[in-house]
Amino acid sequence: MAVNVYSTSVTSENLSRHDMLAWVNDSLHLNYTKIEQLCSGAAYCQFMDMLFPGCVHLRKVKFQAKLEHEYIHNFKVLQAAFKKMGVDKIIPVEKLVKGKFQDNFEFIQWFKKFFDANYDGKDYNPLLARQGQDVAPPPNPGDQIFNKSKKLIGTAVPQRTSPTGPKNMQTSGRLSNVAPPCILRKNPPSARNGGHEADAQILELNQQLLDLKLTVDGLEKERDFYFSKLRDIELICQEHESENSPVISGIIGILYATEEGFAPPEDDEIEEHQQEDQDEY
């Protein structure tokens, strides 16, 4: 069972945000650049696996989580581990998944003290434990791309390059049919080179189209996730509608309020997405 830590006061023992990030990255072999990126909950799940082997089913952890309902799923896994090990700590899930600095910094400060009180110094291979999966930081286009590129300059991390690997391989394959890259740089521009530049541009546009499709699919799942919750609330309200409660009436009024051009998803579509989510779990 775990040793509980109840102190939440700020003391000289608390690490700065930079030191805290360094500890997280060094311990789990990550490349987080902001405290806010802990909002996915994946890092905490693996820390629990490090402290108490077997208390977390890492296969259930969504290491590539990018949407809020996926963060919530990870924190549910963490809550189950807390309960299993007798950790008396209420996880402020609703605050953490919003990705605000202060909420996440306060929680990681507590968790660091909890970790120090329970860690026995045994060896742990985080990459092996998560089967080589990379813990993807929550989407932040400006910082994420820049920091990822900077990391690749000095560190060879195969899984970091996987999202763009196929695109680069295809482009390299096309260019190699003409001449090595060094020769292409020496030759003056020509119509032949222009054709390959057009091919590279087409590949880039296709990749952008794929990225947009994945984004839309994720947003649709998130929409249906919250819509299903509203349907559950609607059913509860309908069961008690005969009580003439002003609270129930107010909730129903909010549920049925619409704006021009709004169209709720069809029931079949919601059930299909819900089945896909269950299959992922």
Swiss-Prot record:
This is Microtubule-associated protein RP/EB family member 3. Its main location: cytoplasm. GO terms for cellular component: cytoplasm; cytoplasmic microtubule; microtubule; microtubule cytoskeleton; microtubule organizing center; microtubule plus-end; midbody; mitotic spindle astral microtubule end. The keyword Cell cycle applies. Composed of two functionally independent domains. The N-terminal domain forms a hydrophobic cleft involved in microtubule binding and the C-terminal is involved in the formation of mutually exclusive complexes with APC and DCTN1. Plus-end tracking protein (+TIP) that binds to the plus-end of microtubules and regulates the dynamics of the microtubule cytoskeleton. Promotes microtubule growth. May be involved in spindle function by stabilizing microtubules and anchoring them at centrosomes. Also acts as a regulator of minus-end microtubule organization: interacts with the complex formed by AKAP9 and PDE4DIP, leading to recruit CAMSAP2 to the Golgi apparatus, thereby tethering non-centrosomal minus-end microtubules to the Golgi, an important step for polarized cell movement. The keyword Nucleotide-binding does not apply. The lineage of its organism: Eukaryota, Metazoa, Chordata, Craniata, Vertebrata. It is found in: Cytoplasm, Cytoskeleton. Belongs to the MAPRE family. Residues 217-281 are annotated as: DCTN1-binding. Residues 158-175 have a biased composition (Polar residues). The modification Phosphoserine is found at residues 162, 176. One of its GO terms (biological process) is spindle assembly. It comes from Rattus norvegicus (Rat).
